Amino acid sequence: MTHTLRVIFAGTPEFAAAALAAIHEAGFPVPLVLTQPDRPAGRGMKLQASAVKRYAVEHGMPVAQPPSLRRAGKFPAEAAEAIELLRATPHDVMVVAAYGLLLPQEVLDIPRAGCINIHASLLPRWRGAAPIHRAIEAGDAETGVTLMQMDVGLDTGAMIDEARIAIAPDDTTATLHDRLAADGARLIVAALERLERDGALPATPQPADGVTYAEKIGKHEAALDWRKAADVLARQVRAFDPFPGGVATLDGAAIKLWAAEPVAARGDAAPGTIVEAAPEGVIVACGAGALRVTQLQKPGGKRLPAREFLAGSPLAAGQRFALPDAA
């Protein structure tokens, strides 16, 4: 099926690429794609295109990569050029998903039908950069995707639609991301079809209560503080998969922990102490309870099940992981 509604798309990572693919496959014309500039990545630190750029190029869509859209920012000339390109590109609506650049009011006002954002939380909870990570870290029972009509605030726009999903006890940011990306793709296609048919999308202001902010994840957060409760640490491990991982330091070596579950305490060992190193998992004493770690990674190595990790890197009861302020 082909559509006449013309969609400019702005996004950067895989979450956004899923939405762009759905829009394209549904038959909506995409006259322009905005994505962040290529960035150095990987061990070789070679420039790599974003997931959105890769999809757009593969499917013959024009791509622009301005470093900013703010005339008053660090790149005023590039921003002005990008804004003129937006004005010169015939379109009806802009869809924004995990773009990573601020859109000033001048840009929001360009599309006839405004800008629709796909946000990976149930707004107003978890506005901001890392909603999936923070929902898992906080122990939320559910999360979802919200479509909103963008305004200049940080994820403060009126809500068009949402989809809710339960957070499973073994969900990681990686697994939850994929389900939310699929839901976001489905929601935006349905919304664009309604917009094309009806000419407008009803939207409801966000409630004033229940606002929380999902701060960007920093590498410094990876260190596990064994003085915390085991269930808190288990959520941290799941929330930080695939980035930045949960890090435990032993004899100066940073070991990444990728899968763990809380278990009952074993004795009265000090937090961070290994109380058992078995093929089924490495059990570590915590501030409350204990953590059974079932997947580990040594520096320069691969993620391994506990059984394989211990075969190559033996651990023993009585060894103690460093506490963050002592690492």
UniProtKB/Swiss-Prot annotation:
UniProt xrefs under InterPro entries: Fmt, Formyl_trans_C, Formyl_trans_C_sf, Formyl_transf_N, Formyl_transf_N_sf, Formyl_transferase-like_C_sf, GART_AS, Met-tRNA-FMT_C
GO molecular function per UniProt: methionyl-tRNA formyltransferase activity
Substrates-to-products reaction catalysed: L-methionyl-tRNA(fMet) + (6R)-10-formyltetrahydrofolate = N-formyl-L-methionyl-tRNA(fMet) + (6S)-5,6,7,8-tetrahydrofolate + H(+)
GO cellular component terms, A-Z: cytosol
Binding sites annotated in the UniProt record for (6S)-5,6,7,8-tetrahydrofolate: S121, L122, L123, P124
UniProt-listed Enzyme Commission number(s): 2.1.2.9
Keywords assigned: Protein biosynthesis, Transferase
Classification via PROSITE patterns: GART
Function per UniProt: Attaches a formyl group to the free amino group of methionyl-tRNA(fMet). The formyl group appears to play a dual role in the initiator identity of N-formylmethionyl-tRNA by promoting its recognition by IF2 and preventing the misappropriation of this tRNA by the elongation apparatus.
Family the entry assigns: Belongs to the Fmt family.
HAMAP family registered for this protein in UniProt: Formyl_trans
Protein name from the UniProt record: Methionyl-tRNA formyltransferase
